Amino acid sequence: MKFAVLVFPGSNCDIDMYHAIKDELGEEVEYVWHTATDLSGFDGVLVPGGFSYGDYLRCGAMANQSNIMAEVKKVADAGKPVLGVCNGFQILTEAGLLPGALLRNTNLKFMCRTVQLKVENNNTLFTNQYEQGQIIHIPIAHGEGNYYCDEETLQSLKDNNQIVFTYSGDNPNGSLEDIAGIINERGNVLGMMPHPERAVDALVGGADGLAVFKSIVKQWRENHVNN
């Protein structure tokens, strides 16, 4: 499987994404600069965290105007997996690929620590290697991770089982319904504030995030290699 890791000015988690795919899973991966205009040669797209364009105007707003985002939408429309983490999640909401928005943390502070997450839906291409209801430990690092949407959208997320991860026990940012990660209705676009790519090696803080990437690869192989 071949992944694209997008790189915007101000991205700083692209290297961790690359490491998770290349070194931990042994899959093919390339960095793709935000000015690129073709993602057709990739099987999946990873939109990393960081501070794209310095978070000026609004987190993810300027990145959404980059050339590459039109291609990301094509990838999503084709049913290929798209994962946005932290700033990547913010970019995906700005692009309209996921509903809602990420607001300032309610304590107005940048939060950087490991949190507990609950796997609310393990029947997705991003979570099939987890158990339903499993509690995992994943780092966060954000100042604007407070997920918000209107009541109609929230009900739709619940009805369609699109809430994939929630904060368990302690909500670090005030996110609505403790939401930490959601997928689109089709199930091939996931946005999450915690950083699974920072939890892929038990020697350096835990490996609970590795299953996100293993899940993507497993689903892809079932759909392509075994057919």
UniProtKB/Swiss-Prot annotation:
Gene3D superfamilies: 3.40.50.880
GO molecular function, one term: ATP binding
Domain of life of the organism encoding this protein: Bacteria
Active site per UniProt: 86 (nucleophile), 195, 197
Pathway in which the depicted protein is active: Purine metabolism; IMP biosynthesis via de novo pathway; 5-amino-1-(5-phospho-D-ribosyl)imidazole from N(2)-formyl-N(1)-(5-phospho-D-ribosyl)glycinamide: step 1/2
E.C. number(s) listed in UniProt: 6.3.5.3, 3.5.1.2
Positions of the Glutamine amidotransferase type-1 domain: 3-226
GO cellular component, one term: cytoplasm
Intracellular or extracellular location(s): Cytoplasm
NCBIfam families: FGAM_synth_I, PRK03619.1
Subunit structure: Part of the FGAM synthase complex composed of 1 PurL, 1 PurQ and 2 PurS subunits.
Protein name: Phosphoribosylformylglycinamidine synthase subunit PurQ
Gene: purQ
